[in-house]
């Protein structure tokens, strides 16, 4: 997590595996490829936060709900960390609203095959499913596609600015996400029943 000031605004930049919650305004930003970010807020209390995560698993099912899968447990853990932090800062769960971003499918090369090639849509499907299951309204979303995104979540008015990034930079982000995904898969192989939060090495 990095803190910066840009044109007088306080910007908090989060990386994969991180989240941030604030009551004092400011902007939370992140760079997304296949990962997803959920922006959650309670407009009555003024509490807002964002996470950045990636589901990692060898196998994905088109029919089984993700919340029941090994990878889904990690996603649930990431979402609950954010929600619990929001509530500790004064948000009420029934007041939470969401916006979701990311989940791009970026192929580093056209010959790329395997589960990583669908991980973006898997992440997008998970975040929609989780929010629906928890009864948290999804007010807006920019999910999937073939380009990475930089997002800026303004926690003073809960607006989100989305900027699609160029193909070359999207490919760099895809390599980062693949490393994160492989690290997560290896962790599941070693401890298949554990749920861990991790950062790219």
Curated annotation (Swiss-Prot):
GO molecular function: protein-glutamine glutaminase activity
Catalyses which reaction(s): L-glutaminyl-[protein] + H2O = L-glutamyl-[protein] + NH4(+)
Statement: the UniProt record of this protein carries the keyword Hydrolase: yes
GO biological process, one term: chemotaxis
PANTHER family: CHEMORECEPTOR GLUTAMINE DEAMIDASE CHED 1-RELATED (PTHR35147:SF3), CHEMORECEPTOR GLUTAMINE DEAMIDASE CHED-RELATED (PTHR35147)
UniProt record similarity statement: Belongs to the CheD family.
Protein name as catalogued: Probable chemoreceptor glutamine deamidase CheD 1
Organism: Geobacter sulfurreducens (strain ATCC 51573 / DSM 12127 / PCA)
């Amino acid at each position: 997590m990095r803190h910066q000031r840009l044109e007088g605004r306080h910007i908090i930049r989060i990386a994969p595996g991180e989240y941030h919650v604030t009551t004092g305004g400011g902007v939370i930003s992140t760079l997304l490829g296949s990962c997803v970010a959920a922006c959650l807020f309670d407009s009555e209390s003024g509490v807002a936060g964002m996470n950045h995560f990636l589901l990692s698993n060898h196998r994905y099912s088109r029919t089984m709900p993700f919340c029941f899968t090994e990878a889904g447990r990690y996603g649930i853990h990431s979402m609950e960390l954010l929600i619990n932090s929001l509530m500790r800062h004064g948000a009420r769960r029934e007041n939470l609203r969401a916006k979701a971003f990311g989940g791009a499918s970026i192929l580093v090369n056209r010959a790329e095959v395997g589960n990583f090639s669908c991980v973006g849509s898997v992440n997008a499907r998970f975040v929609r499913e989780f929010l629906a299951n928890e009864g948290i309204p999804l007010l807006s979303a920019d999910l999937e596609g073939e380009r990475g995104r930089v997002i800026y979540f303004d926690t003073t008015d809960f607006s989100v600015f989305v900027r699609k990034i160029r193909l070359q930079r999207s490919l760099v982000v895809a390599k980062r996400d693949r490393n994160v995904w492989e690290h997560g898969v290896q962790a599941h192989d070693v401890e298949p029943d554990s749920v861990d939060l991790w950062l790219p090495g």
